[in-house]
Regions:
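Solvent-exposed loop/turn and edge beta-strand elements of beta-rich ligand-binding domains
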Residues: 2-267
Length: 267
């Protein structure tokens, strides 16, 4: 008699971390006054806790908006920004799979859209990515755009943006690192033989069909390893299986009695 045991267990998780640029230099060359001031948001997905998984396909977006009320720390010292002053209402960090786990997203404000010096407050909100296993970061963040007189000593009405800060909810710190958590899974197949007619040297080929659970597929690749049932699979170099555009993949592996197939990085 030949018996096959298949188990599916939670394998691990990876952290998706946002390094949100908080105090950033403008794009104007020294000595040149530019109306536009471009800052950047850097989105990083930490893959260290998801061995075997490729960086998922998909976009993580942030919405730049106005605030209904100024946060308490800004009351009396800042003003509410307006919708007309927002040039980029949606910031998108697009990931294309493979190993590229950091995306930089520029966003711009224009000093011509402001009429007076001051600190202008806007909201920055992460939108749920719709990626199975990836949590949404719901922390409140603000963008502070500082507008100053071009010539503080002799103001002429000309303005420039001196800096842009992304800060946390209470305004006490730069909101430059935000962590999202992704849960990855593993699948193992073990072959046991029993009975007088079993041949320990026979190899059995298994075909495992994988399908991304998301309506829009995000999985990019998984890792397949084979070895002895009690082997330390962390020391085994596996094969990368790339997922198709529709989120499906087919894993084929042959093992003999007492051996195991391990597929890691499953969404």
């Amino acid at each position: 008699m030949k018996t096959t045991y298949i188990s599916r267990a939670k394998f691990g998780k990876f952290t998706a971390a946002i390094a949100a640029a908080a105090l950033l230099a403008g794009t104007a060359a020294p000595g040149v006054l530019a109306a536009d001031y471009t800052a950047q948001l850097t989105k990083t997905i930490d893959m260290t806790a998801a061995p075997g998984a490729g960086v998922p396909h998909g976009s993580i977006t942030f919405t730049v908006g106005t605030v209904a009320n100024l946060p308490s720390w800004a009351a009396g010292t800042a003003v509410k920004g307006t919708a007309a002053q927002i040039k980029s209402t949606e910031l998108t960090a697009a990931f294309t799979g493979g190993t590229a786990n950091t995306v930089t997203v520029p966003f711009t404000f224009d000093s011509d859209d402001f009429t007076a010096p001051g600190d202008y407050i806007f909201s920055l909100t992460e939108t749920a990515a719709g990626i199975t296993g990836l949590t949404q970061d719901t922390a409140a963040r603000y963008i502070v755009v500082r507008v100053v007189n071009t010539d503080p000593a002799a103001p002429t009405g000309a303005l420039r943006i001196s800096d842009i800060n992304i800060v946390n909810a209470d305004g006490t710190a730069k909101a430059d690192e935000v962590t999202n958590t992704y849960a990855a899974y593993g699948l193992s197949v073990v072959k046991h033989l029993s009975g007088n007619f079993a041949n320990a040297g026979d190899e059995f080929t298994f075909t495992i069909a994988l399908d991304d659970p998301d309506e829009t597929p995000h999985a990019s690749s998984v890792t397949v390893k084979t070895g002895g049932e009690s082997a330390d699979f962390s020391t085994i170099t596996g094969d990368t299986v790339t997922c198709n555009a529709d989120g499906t993949a087919e894993v084929k592996a042959g093992i003999t009695g007492g051996e195991k197939i391990e597929v890691t990085g499953l969404p």
